[in-house]
Amino acid sequence: MKILLFVVLFFNVLVGIYSIDTTIFTVCLNCKDGGIIKNVTLANRCSYLICKDENVDQQDQLTRSFSVKKRLTNGYIFDVYKNNQCSTRSNAFEMTKALTCNGEWLELNSFIKVKCGELDPNSSPSPSPSPSPSPSPSPSPSPSPSPSPSPSPSPSPSPSPSPSPSPSPSSSLEESQTPSQTPTPTQTPTPTQTQTTTPTQTQTLTPTQTQTPSQTPTPSQTPKPTQTPTQTPTPSQTPSQTPSQTPSQTPSQTPTPTPSQTPTPTQTPSQTPTQTQTPTPTQTPISSRPMSISTEKPSSSEEVIQASSEFNESSSEDKKKDSESKSSQSESPSPSASASESESASESASASTSVSVSASPLPIMDSSSSDSEENVSPTPLHKRGTPPPPFIHHSSSNELLEKNSDGNSSCKNIPKYLLIMVSLFLYFLF
């Protein structure tokens, strides 16, 4: 666009210079008695008459104003306003021929005066005969003043060739008037072209503005996929929480891939289901058992001691097993109480101790836990499939130890999911 505008401006400058240099004007002045009448012919444009006379009506009809723009070597450049013939403003023109005003100031209008230039060397011998032929053709195109016919008969026989060139400018005047009307439409479209170019520029600007916002949302959409891979550290946060809660690792890893893949377009819902849904199933069953063990174990051990003491005092008809059970009961509360005290001392590491004890001394902890559970409620043994002994409430811990020593009933008492959880925990640790 800039190159095109530069080319257009350069072309206009060239055309303006060419028009100024090549426009030729024929100036016909009657310089006798101070040059009252000046007949000026603009080449191919307009023909107007400047009258510095008392006849104001003629002056108002033909021309109104002139403004001097630039002085050249031979003349001046004018901007011409015509009321009758040239309604639009004509371009600047150059006075190539000097004004024959004898070096005096010629008043073009009531407020503008132009000093006459020097005469050309070719036209210097002809200032005296020039007024004589000029009035002779002047009556034909336009009315001439009364003093003009008086000098015409005196020099008419001498300059016989002069009338021959004199009609030529008169004919040029008539010809110039006829094409003067034709260029008027040529001047009128020039403002229309300028008006058409301006809306085209405004219309070209509007689509460029609409295209730029269409490009701006594309970078706004691109950072959205870049933010989705940043959600990958969410699994890195889950293993940091899993070592604190050892059993909760296995269920937390299994449901996490399903919600993480589904809410990839949305950022917030992908994080919320992993934190809310996974801990609830894992923490409730696991936290309930160590709490029941820690709270019920001291009470269960005391109840076992009281029940065993009352049973030993009341039952004198039992065999040697009852006496051995009394001795074993005195020994059994100590590990159960120590285990319960060790678990109640550190509540924060309850899950870790329960898993470690169940990993290495499985029969001992299972015996204590099964003892406490059997003394509290007989239902777990019925559910596990083992037949209940004849006196479940008064059963001693020695019988349970004997069952665990066989190795057959110890594996039945442990649920399968606990073994799977312990094995997975050991697998992830090592």
Swiss-Prot record:
Q: Where in the cell is it found?
A: Secreted
Q: Name one GO cellular component term.
A: extracellular region
Whose protein is this, by species? Dictyostelium discoideum
According to the UniProt entry, which residue ranges have a biased composition of type Polar residues? 286-303
Signal peptide limits: 1-19
Where is the sequence biased in composition, kind Pro residues?
A: 124-168
Top-rank lineage group of the source organism: Eukaryota
Biased composition, class Low complexity, residue ranges: 169-253, 263-285, 326-370
Annotated segments matching region Disordered = 119-408
- Bias class Basic and acidic residues marks the residues at 316-325
Q: What is this protein called?
A: Putative uncharacterized protein DDB_G0290521
Keywords on this record? Glycoprotein, Secreted, Signal
